[in-house]
From Swiss-Prot:
This is Kinesin-related protein 10. One of its GO terms (molecular function) is microtubule motor activity. It comes from Dictyostelium discoideum (Social amoeba). Microtubule-associated force-producing protein that plays a role in organelle transport. Its motor activity is directed toward the microtubule's plus end. Cooperates with kif8 and dynein to organize interphase microtubules. Residues 437-464, 1191-1203, 1229-1238 have a biased composition (Polar residues). Belongs to the TRAFAC class myosin-kinesin ATPase superfamily. Kinesin family. It is found in: Cytoplasm, Cytoskeleton. One of its GO terms (biological process) is cell division. InterPro entries: Kinesin-like_fam, Kinesin_motor_CS, Kinesin_motor_dom, Kinesin_motor_dom_sf, P-loop_NTPase. ATP binds at residues 116-123.
Amino acid sequence: MNNNNNNNNNKTTMNSMIVTVRIRPESQSEILNKNCKTIVRVIDDNMLVFDPNDIDIGAFNNNRNNKQSQQPVEQKYIFDRVFDQYATQEEVFENTTKELVSYVISGHNASVFAYGASGAGKTHTMVGGINTGPGIMVLTMKELFSLIEKDRSNQYIVSMSYLEVYNETIRDLLITNTGGGGNSNNKVLELCEDENKQIVIRDLSWEYPTSADQVFKLLKYGNLNRKQSPTQTNQTSSRSHAVLQITVKQQNLQDKSKISFGKLSLIDLAGSERASKTLNTGDRLKEGTSINKSLLALGNCIKALGELCKNQQSQQQSSNPNFIPYRDSKLTRILKDSLTGSCKTIMIANISPNSSSFEETHNTLKYAQRAKSIKTQITKNVFASSTNLITQYNEIIKEQREEIKQLKLKLIQATSNNNNSNNNNNNNNNNYFSNSFGSCGNKNQPIKQPTPPTSLFHQQNQKYYRNDDDDDDDNDQEENNDEVLINEDDEEVDGEDSNNRDNDESMIQQLEEMSLLINSNLQDTLTLKKTQSIQRQRKRELENELKSLEKQQQSILNENNNVDIIKRTNEIGSQILKIKTLESSINEKLEMNNQWRRKLQSELTLKFVNSPKNLKILIQQARAATLELDRFDLTERMIDDRSKLNLKTNECKSLKDSLSWMFGILSDGFKLLTENNLATDDFLKDFLKSGDLINNLDNSFIINENNDSNNNNIIENDDIDLSFNNDINNNNNNNNNNNNNNNNNNNNNNNNNNNNNNNNNNNNNNNNNNNNNNVPLNCNNSNSNINNKNQNIINPSPLKPRRIMSGSNNIIKSTNSNSRMTSTATTTAASTATATTTTIGKEKKGEIRSIVNPINKISSSTSLLPSSSTKISNTTPLYSRTSILRKRTLEIDDSTDSNPRTKKINVSSPVVTKPKQLLPSTTTATTTTLSSPLVNKPKQILPTTSSLQPKPHTKIQPHKNNNNNNNNIAPQMNMNIQIPNPIPIPIPMHVQIPISNPIPMPSPSSMNLKEKLDSLSQLCNNRSAKNENYNHNNSFNSQNPFVHPLQMHPPQLQLPLHPPQTMIMQSNMDLKMKLDSLSFFNNNNNNHQAQNDLSFDYGQNTLSNENLILHNKIASLSSTLINQPHPMRVKKLTPTSTISSSISTRPITTSTTTSTTVPSVVSNRIKSLVHSNSPIKENLYKEKLSSTASATLTPNRNNSQIVQPFKRGVLGNGPTSSSSRLLPSSRTTVNTSRKIIK
């Protein structure tokens, strides 16, 4: 049959492989096993979800040992068609193979193969069963012969073969030898290729069925010969691959020169097996090995074909573009035409929905997904008629003509007998049937073997050659016989109608009962799920409340309410226990309903197999119920996932804020350590790593300054007035900067030396040297030119100061701000040292944090200070801690009376802006001015006017130098603080707030050095005095005066301050820093050089007796204060690197008497700070130097105030944490009296 010349010139078309998935119903053992769950959920006709995260049954474990340790995979797969557990054999056939039958008859090749693991339902799909009905093979042959019978214009020859591949050997299943397919007596067949490179199997038998019944008998016989053995996973496991090949030859009766040829291959593959799961040994193990080998080769071919098709689509070239490993197995060689030939292929992937077959199902879905990308070229097979075939047909025609003549003679004899005798009706009826169907009368006669389908041609040709006279005789005969047949049929119909009625009534009753059961199961399950959802929500609320109560119970602030907390905790525990009991009962009922639905999937088709219409109705109802339950589960899951996502988002946000806050403290410590030459290489490396981690934490941390510069919001706020004059040094008397737009960028190195400089920027076209991008800044030396981000400085009206959110800084400048920045500073760095600006976080709108990351070891002197003024009221919003790198050109006044001169130095240093906090409110308001030499930290408290009202603005005047030996003074930071009513809100430790009567402190400019030393001596001598009026109820733990910066509270928390009336005073360490500063201020023109201890070398013949006495006095006071050597070891301190003191504009002298008690812990702490080599030494040392020890003041009856230092207040906008405490560091009693001096 294959020796035909192929003259096919038809066009070829590309067609993708059709991939479908069928999910089998679960077995009884799988349903009863509580450890196994359903892991496949059908969404619609084209999509399924593998291993879903079901809420009611929990996430299933996708590992081999069924351990609930891994999260569900939840992979979504889309195929050409997905059949759920309710799908019938007819439904699968109609949506897969039915269209292929007409496709094959028209002269094309097609193949259908079932792929899957052992026990997944492949044989059930292809062959069928007694209870479930026939499979695809049987239904396909029925459809084929029905189409052939309907087509009267063509002649057809149908042939079939049935073989198996067992242990890599090919066996014929239709042979008549005894033993069957598994017997060794069967002949092993060989594969070969013909001249057209088509696969041919030698000695394979071909049968020529003439009806579907003959095909059923042949299939039944072949399946009995097929090798099957029971295994651990399947009692009727197929141990071989079965291939049913059907060829159809078509010849047009009008044009007999054209013959089309079509081939349909139906393949039932054996299932892949896992030896550890099947527990096979001996022959079963050998069979499983061969099966897995051939399936692996098939999988490799599918994978290679998929990659080849992808490369062809993308026009890419692979290493082996044309190599497909067909020869790895005999199965792949047989399926070569089906995979890559001119063939339309349909793959039916059979999977199990149970979790016991997790890996097998997952692998099957992956191979099916790959097979979707395979494309084949489809060509119609049309052959020219050969001479041998024509002669064969001529012989058939001759035989048919002879038969026609014989039949005509018989017909004549029969008609003559009918005229003679009218009583032989039975004989006439037989003659009628023989004359009507020609070849049926000769059905028992043998037919010559190369032409088995002759009966089909004979039936068709007989109809064409019949005479008209015969037709008339037959019509008369039909009228006589119809009366007899009708009478007999009426009697049979009456009996059958009564039986059918009874059957229909019982069937309808069963249908109604099953429909009610499905509906009741759906309603009951939905009610239980809704109740379960409500109880889960209630349980979460109670658990959250329980956690908050446990935190309150651990806090010392709620000792009085412990009884109520314990009572409420017990109530919540009992409620949670009841909810858990109710949930367990609900889960049991849900499991019972789920088991009933799973059983229904397999029992439904068995009960109503004889009534397909009723079966379809019930299947639709069951699918609708399943879809409703899935929709409810998905809705609940979406709600649950959304709540979890919001919770995680808030946690991530708080963690980011905490990390940014902690890194801000670390950057401050780095600044102080590098300024004092205490930073080690390990610390610098760790600091760089932490900076990179913070920078790469999230893209949301990085601010797009292009957007910020174009969207700078001007916020009118009467409560905040912050002025920073750091970037532009204007030596002016009147400097009016009117910036009506926020997109004005100024040059960092801009020095305006004009007396009147009016800058009116009313448009957006101000182009400067600065770009609004996060560009790293490289500083190779101290004189490196860096273009940094500028600020938009405005000059609002005196009544309504405005707050500008500009780029990375919040700038608000009050009216008539006349200032002159004259500072002394120097920066020294190694020649290879560099610094980069790293953007680490977005604390609030328009704020950015930048730090200097040194790559090599950097040594520098003390930082340069900005001039700032702050005005805060009771409605002040919280703001965040920022550390901003600024490039400044400072004017250094390095002049004497004889040699006046100035220097300009480019300096890059981080300027720390301290965090906002809500301040306690009072009925009266005071104004205080604070200054700091190192960071923006309070140093002094200045008295206010008698009106106790805040000034609308402050004036920062240049320092008036009354002493020739005084050097350039650092600019002063003034803070106008309007104090509202007292409320228990924490105050940062760097802010000093008097409550009712402000404490007048001496101004450095109004006192000479002797008066300063006298007052400081009095403070140090009285520090051992005890405070008898100390209120112990307001005290806190004082064993830890110094706190590591990373142990401080994150910005989103706030601690309540007890008692409500608070005041912050300076610590002993701050006082010591003041003594050291005074020593530097008094002698910085004499080229001082600091030694390792507190002894200073003032040079030769440059120190007067008076200064020497003062120096000794300072040293003794310092050592008395701390009882330890000074921790700051500065080497080679130059005159331009000294710390300048802050000068107040109001000469006020105050006599102060202070009694201070310093615990011994302070001394030990400083020892550990100085001599320890721990990695946190720098941070602790920074805390000691830069932070002012806070104190709490409580009014006393003796008109004295108790100072209680505590740990730095927590930053940010969070709720109060009851578990945190404010720890005191020392107790100080201050008696003050004011004396105003002109």
